[in-house]
Amino acid sequence: MAKKKDTPGDGEFPGFSDTLQRTPKLEKPHYAGHRDRLKQRFRDAPDALADYELLELLLFRAIRRADTKPIAKALLNRFGSIAEVLAAPENLIAEIPGAGPTVALELKLVEAIAKRSARSTVMEREVLGSWDKVINYCTAAMAFETREQFRILFLDKKNKLIADEVQQTGTVDHTPVYPREVVKRALELSATAIILVHNHPSGDPTPSRADIDMTKQLVNAAKALNITVHDHVIIGKHGHASLRSLRLI
């Protein structure tokens, strides 16, 4: 009968147990557990989270094993608000310490989804009856652009949005607009009405003299071909101006 092999005991390896006891335990990084707690706080009360905490959560996907709080705060310090962080140029986001191209891409993806979501609320709908949604969409799309954009919303005879196009992109304070090209594009799309929209990167939506004069030229050019200009809306960072509401059309 084979003799059972004895299992070595502590006495056979002097000092072995002492070595185990002296081996320091690996400490978890200080942010371990913080991610789970922050996720749970979001589930319980998303509106209670600070802006930097929402950005932290967003960065979890792009940054797997690091504390995202300093990066989130640095982004807000650099650009101002969540909306301005998302609208910031990709190369400037990547310059933030700890961010890099992966974080920049993640944020631009979220911005694109937000714009697409806002746009879906106005496409193929009666625009004049959904004016707040139109303004919300234009604000999401243009308010934090660093250069002026001239956008046209083309409508059919039922005032449903059939196309939304950026016709021109200019400088920080000027966008060239050509009434003939605007009217030509409306005819190509069989649009019977249009809404003009452009942004002021300065943040102040007050129409300039040039804005007013250009609008009048466009109204006259469109009227000659039975195309109605419903409004010209100027988008700022914290508000908008309607030339029709101001009785400038």
UniProtKB/Swiss-Prot annotation:
Keywords: Hydrolase, Metal-binding, Metalloprotease, Protease, Zinc. A motif (JAMM motif) lies at residues 198-211. Residues 24-34 have a biased composition (Basic and acidic residues). Residues 127-249 form the MPN domain. InterPro entries: MPN, RadC_JAB, RuvA_2-like, UPF0758, UPF0758_CS. Pfam families: RadC (PF04002). Zn(2+) binds at H198, H200, D211. It comes from the Bacteria. Residues 1-34 are annotated as: Disordered. One of its GO terms (molecular function) is metal ion binding. Coiled coil: none annotated. GO terms for biological process: proteolysis. Belongs to the UPF0758 family. This is UPF0758 protein BCAN_A1306. It comes from Brucella canis (strain ATCC 23365 / NCTC 10854 / RM-666). The lineage of its organism: Bacteria, Pseudomonadati, Pseudomonadota, Alphaproteobacteria, Hyphomicrobiales.
